């Protein structure tokens, strides 16, 4: 009886976790139209938990039956290995994200704000988070100049660099402290083209990178490859966006490690 009760509670927990996962990862898509490999992965994992909870006993019986056969043991072993490798990469990536986001600025005099999306001619929520973090730092460190990096994408009336420039100048940051880099279409290009501005203007290659906390690690790795020495100022990601972009970033980190 006690064993049945434990299994019942486990199924309930799996159902709740599955439905919560589907909701959390679908919410950005439903409300903001955000769709990427992060929320796709989250929704698929949530559905898998729901299906497992629904067919709990049937799945367990089938696995036990497979485990009596050599082929079944091999398949289960491969699946377990894949899961362990995925969990290992996720854990390592998470640790790297956290450590990079804690890399506080020292006496750097150059800042790079990485663009991430414009709605018409206004910054997206995530870009606003980055810009607010940049503004707070620039407002209290008047010796710091700032490179605003981001080209013009689909659905954007102006470049991300121009949008950031307008946002910061409207809030009172002096125009002569801001440089626009408006050709980039990826994090790698953000930093490569910003490096050219640093060299052209004879600026210090030790820079502060402003992006969201989950993105700081990969941005810092790419920066180091281009010869930039980075520290971090992070925009605080809205809680309902973080799971989606966290999972997407894990894919980006693994890709960066492998390739």
What are these regions (language model features)?
Residues 1-7, 18-22, 112, 134:
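Intrinsic structural disorder
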Residues 2-5, 33-34, 59-74:
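Membrane-interface helix-boundary motifs at transmembrane edges
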Residues 3, 10, 14, 245-259:
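Short hydrophobic helices that act as membrane-entry/anchoring signals
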Residues 9-61:
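Membrane-embedded alpha-helical segments of integral membrane proteins
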Residues 13, 17, 45, 78-85, ...:
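Hydrophobic alpha-helical transmembrane segments of polytopic
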Residues 23-30, 54-58, 88-98, 254-258:
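Structural signature of transmembrane alpha-helix termini at the membrane-water interface
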Residues 68-93:
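Internal/C-terminal transmembrane anchor helices
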Residues 91-248:
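A structural signal for short, hydrophobic/glycine-enriched beta-strand patches
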